[in-house]
């Protein structure tokens, strides 16, 4: 009891009871530097910088939030206009790292590499305006052999012209494979060989119902 009274009469608070490390304020331009290899996998995945190579973590890049900046062009979701701007440091490092590999890769793989590196999970995939934007860049589909596109990816709430699969563009309804219709009740239950386009001969024994 005497100990508690002496501690209560002290004019100061013991440092052991105070929180010494405070988190960064929400509306602040202070940048935190953490050592990458010590991060847990989940934190390292969540705090990966925006303009970085796929599978790498950028270090020492300024990432403006756009909340306290007077110039909105410096925000993290906008691309700077000047290529020599210091805010493009990580992008220039990414482009220099993958420029040699892009020349040796097919165009489809280069397209996929840029998609995954520039993907912004904060912005949704569909928009209510015809101009599709992927991240902060205007996106235009290019026909790449072997890659499937959604025909109404830039049309929010627009139904396709036919009631069939809408993930293979420019393919008429009769030419569609039997398993691509949206209504599973319309799928054929007979086995079908896509390579020969033949169906098995009807068996003589009736099938039980």
Curated annotation (Swiss-Prot):
Pfam families: TKTI1. GO terms for biological process: flagellated sperm motility. GO terms for cellular component: axonemal A tubule inner sheath; axonemal microtubule; sperm flagellum. Transmembrane segments: none annotated. Its main location: cytoplasm. Keywords: Cell projection, Cilium, Cytoplasm, Cytoskeleton, Flagellum. It is found in: Cytoplasm, Cytoskeleton, Cilium axoneme; Cytoplasm, Cytoskeleton, Flagellum axoneme. InterPro entries: TKTI1. Microtubule inner protein component of sperm flagellar doublet microtubules. PANTHER family: HYPOTHETICAL PROTEIN LOC690617 (PTHR31254), TEKTIN BUNDLE-INTERACTING PROTEIN 1 (PTHR31254:SF1). Microtubule inner protein (MIP) part of the dynein-decorated doublet microtubules (DMTs) in cilia axoneme, which is required for motile cilia beating. Located at the center of the tektin bundle where may function to recruit tektins or stabilize the bundle. This is Tektin bundle-interacting protein 1. It comes from Macaca fascicularis. The lineage of its organism: Eukaryota, Metazoa, Chordata, Craniata, Vertebrata. The gene is TEKTIP1.
């Amino acid at each position: 009891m005497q100990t508690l009274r002496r501690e209560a009469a002290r004019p100061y608070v013991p440092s052991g009871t105070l929180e010494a490390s405070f988190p960064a304020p929400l509306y602040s331009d202070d940048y935190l530097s953490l050592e990458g290899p010590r991060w847990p996998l989940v934190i390292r995945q969540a705090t990966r910088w925006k303009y970085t190579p796929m599978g790498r973590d950028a270090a020492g890049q300024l990432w403006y939030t756009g909340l306290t900046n007077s110039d909105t062009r410096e925000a993290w979701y906008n691309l700077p206009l000047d290529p020599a701007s210091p805010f493009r440091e990580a992008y220039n490092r990414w482009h220099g790292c993958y420029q040699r590999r892009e020349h040796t890769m097919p165009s489809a793989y280069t397209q996929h590499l840029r998609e995954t590196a520039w993907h912004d999970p904060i912005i949704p995939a569909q928009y209510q305006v015809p101009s599709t934007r992927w991240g902060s860049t205007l996106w235009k589909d290019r026909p790449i052999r072997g890659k499937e596109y959604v025909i109404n990816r830039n049309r929010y709430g627009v139904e396709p012209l036919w009631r069939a699969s809408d993930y293979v563009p420019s393919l008429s309804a009769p030419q569609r494979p039997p398993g691509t219709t949206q209504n599973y009740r319309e799928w054929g239950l007979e086995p079908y060989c896509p390579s020969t386009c033949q169906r098995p001969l009807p068996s003589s024994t009736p099938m039980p119902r």
